[in-house]
C-alpha cells in the first residue's frame, strides 16, 4: 500500500472517530476543523511541520475562560445563599485539573488526541494535564462553533448533573451556609442531633437531624457524624430555598 493511501486510510479512520464523538454527545460541529484542532497537541503539529497556531493551545486559553464563566453563572443561580468565598472554592474544585480529567475520560477524549510519536511513547494520551487541556480546548471550540448556549447545553449533560449529585460536596460547607443564612435573617437557633448510629465499626452509618427553634429542617445520612450533619444542613438549605420561592 502506498504512503498516500496509508494517509487517506488514517484520515478516514480519524474522521469516523470524531463522528462517533459527535453522535455520542449529540452535537454536530459546523466547522469540523475546530473540533479536530481541539484535540491536536503541539507535539503533533511540530512533528508534521504544521503552522504553530494549528494546535489546541489557543482554544484551551479560550475554553478556560468560557468554562469559568459558565460554571460561575450556574453556581450563582444554583446556590443563592452561598457566599463569594464558598462559590470561589467550589468553582475551583470543579474546574481544577483532576476534575476536568474525569470529565474528559468519561467521554473517552484521550482516544481522539492527535499526538507526536514521542509524546505517544511517553504516555501522553493518559497524562492528566494533557487531558484537562483537551477538555478546555473542546469547550473553546464549541463556543466558537455554536456559541455560549451550546456550551451550556453540553455542560448540562456532562458537568452540572455531577454538581447536583454532590460530586463536589466535600468542598461545600453546608453547615456554614445554613448558619450564615439563619444569622442574617435573625431566625433563631440551630441545633444538630445524631438520631441513629448503625452498622459495624468499620462501616458505620450515622443519621443526623438539624432543627431551627425546635422545628426540623433536614435529615442527613453519612459515614461520619460530620458528614451526616453536612447532609442534614444541605437538606435544610433546600427546604428554605423552596419556601423562599413560594
UniProtKB/Swiss-Prot annotation:
It comes from the Bacteria. Its EC number is 3.1.26.3. GO terms for molecular function: double-stranded RNA binding; metal ion binding; ribonuclease III activity; rRNA binding. Pfam families: dsrm, Ribonucleas_3_3. InterPro entries: dsRBD_dom (IPR014720), RNase_III (IPR011907), RNase_III_dom (IPR000999), RNase_III_sf (IPR036389). It is an enzyme of class 3 (hydrolase). PANTHER family: RIBONUCLEASE 3 (PTHR11207:SF0), RIBONUCLEASE III (PTHR11207). HAMAP family: RNase_III. Homodimer. This is Ribonuclease 3. It comes from Geobacillus kaustophilus (strain HTA426). The gene is rnc.
Amino acid at each position: 500500500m502506498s504512503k498516500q493511501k496509508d494517509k487517506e486510510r488514517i484520515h478516514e479512520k480519524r474522521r469516523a472517530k470524531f463522528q462517533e464523538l459527535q453522535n455520542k454527545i449529540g452535537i454536530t460541529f459546523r466547522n469540523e476543523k475546530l473540533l479536530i484542532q481541539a484535540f491536536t497537541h503541539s507535539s503533533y503539529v511540530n512533528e508534521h511541520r504544521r503552522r504553530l497556531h494549528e494546535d489546541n493551545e489557543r482554544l484551551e486559553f479560550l475554553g478556560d475562560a468560557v468554562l469559568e464563566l459558565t460554571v460561575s453563572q450556574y453556581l450563582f443561580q444554583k446556590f443563592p445563599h452561598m457566599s463569594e468565598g464558598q462559590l470561589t472554592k467550589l468553582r475551583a474544585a470543579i474546574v481544577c485539573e483532576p476534575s476536568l480529567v474525569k470529565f474528559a475520560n468519561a467521554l473517552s477524549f484521550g482516544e481522539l488526541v492527535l499526538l507526536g510519536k514521542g509524546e505517544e511513547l511517553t504516555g501522553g494520551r493518559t497524562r492528566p494535564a494533557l487531558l484537562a487541556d483537551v477538555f478546555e480546548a473542546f469547550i473553546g471550540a464549541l463556543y466558537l462553533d455554536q456559541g455560549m448556549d451550546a456550551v451550556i447545553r453540553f455542560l448540562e449533560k456532562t458537568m452540572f448533573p455531577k454538581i447536583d449529585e454532590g460530586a463536589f460536596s466535600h468542598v461545600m460547607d453546608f453547615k456554614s451556609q445554613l448558619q450564615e443564612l439563619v444569622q442574617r435573617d435573625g431566625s433563631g437557633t440551630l441545633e444538630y442531633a445524631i438520631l441513629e448510629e448503625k452498622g459495624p465499626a468499620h462501616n458505620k452509618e450515622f443519621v443526623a437531624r438539624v432543627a431551627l427553634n425546635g422545628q426540623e429542617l433536614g435529615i442527613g445520612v453519612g459515614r461520619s457524624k460530620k458528614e451526616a450533619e453536612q447532609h442534614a444542613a444541605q437538606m435544610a438549605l433546600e427546604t428554605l430555598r423552596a419556601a423562599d420561592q413560594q
